[in-house]
């Protein structure tokens, strides 16, 4: 891979465009691709291409390391040496690749490039985009199995955690409200607010084939305590169990 300063020369009138590249071959291909699409960063080179067609040849002016200060200095030297701003196709001094910012048709170029990308993505479709750009798991260069941990229920959790929020044990001292009690006023407010609503963490329960929305419903039906319902669910003697638990 060669880097440095190059020129694109019109073989009909000898006018040139001076540029810099980290890889000459790749940069030249990009130039002609943009010219064919009509969205080149140099409006003067684009107009000449539109008028004369592909009568251009590329050549290396100077091979140098691709370092910003050095590249800008030598590119500006060749722009002045070949007079390519006044009698050529350069529209600005060297900018280390940023030629779009000073382009008179900047907005039009951005719009064309945006439309091209959108059309490409639309043509690929969801499956095509996933196959082409998705890099899950070990295919991703930043993937590290040590930073991925899963709870027994299958939910991804932080590496410092032992369980997900849903599976976490909140009984006894594990409960932040342990040894605390609500006041009668607070209990009354909570009761009024929760009337007609069912808790989000309720589980359906099967009691000998009869399905109930929650343990409380089963307790009311059999006229027993919720604690006894829980006991029978955990006991091997009873055909009681939570559904999808």
UniProtKB/Swiss-Prot annotation:
Give one GO biological process term.
Answer: negative regulation of DNA-templated transcription
This entry's Enzyme Commission designation comes to 3.1.-.-
Question: Which CDD domains does this chain map to?
Answer: GIY-YIG_Cterm, GIY-YIG_HE_I-TevI_like
PROSITE patterns reported in the protein's UniProt record? GIY_YIG
Molecular function via GO: DNA binding; DNA-binding transcription repressor activity; double-stranded DNA endonuclease activity; endonuclease activity; sequence-specific DNA binding; zinc ion binding
Name the keywords, alphabetized. Answer: Endonuclease, Hydrolase, Intron homing, Magnesium, Nuclease
- Identify the stretch annotated as signal peptide in this record: none
| Cofactor annotation | Mg(2+)
Q: Name one GO cellular component term.
A: transcription repressor complex
Q: Which residues form the GIY-YIG domain?
A: 1-88
Function in brief:
This endonuclease is specific to the thymidylate synthase (td) gene splice junction and is involved in intron homing.
Give the similarity note.
To endonucleases of group I introns of fungi and phage.
* Listed name of the protein: Intron-associated endonuclease 1
Query: What organism, scientifically named, is this protein from?
Result: Enterobacteria phage T4
